[in-house]
UniProtKB/Swiss-Prot annotation:
The keyword Acetylation applies. One of its GO terms (biological process) is adult locomotory behavior. The keyword Transport does not apply. This is Cystatin-B. It comes from Mus musculus (Mouse).
Length: 98
């Protein structure tokens, strides 16, 4: 993978689900709703001055959200940040940079 270029889409892992779970409350606050279903499906990784994770999350009802989560470098000792997100996505929608 080139620095700065997003990776290919990969199936979600336990680590991906953990990241999604950590920013779930940020999304719920921004959207003013609770998500009973919040299951990571797939992800892409982009190495920058830290890591951007693009995560497709199943939120139930045949709907998905796409999350862009920034993971700072370990020595910065900062929390994960929900940088951006897209709602009203479906499972077949491509996970791309946004």
């Amino acid at each position: 993978m080139m620095c700065g270029a997003p990776s290919a889409t990969m199936p979600a892992t336990a680590e991906t689900q953990e990241v999604a779970d950590q920013v779930k409350s940020q999304l719920e606050s921004k959207e003013n709703q609770k998500f009973d279903v919040f299951k990571a499906i797939s992800f892409k990784r982009q190495i920058v001055a830290g890591t951007n994770l693009f995560i497709k999350v199943d939120v139930g009802g045949d709907k998905c959200v796409h999350l862009r989560v920034f993971q700072p470098l370990p020595h910065e000792n900062k929390p994960l940040t929900l940088s951006s997100y897209q709602t009203n996505k479906e499972r077949h929608d491509e996970l791309s940079y946004f």
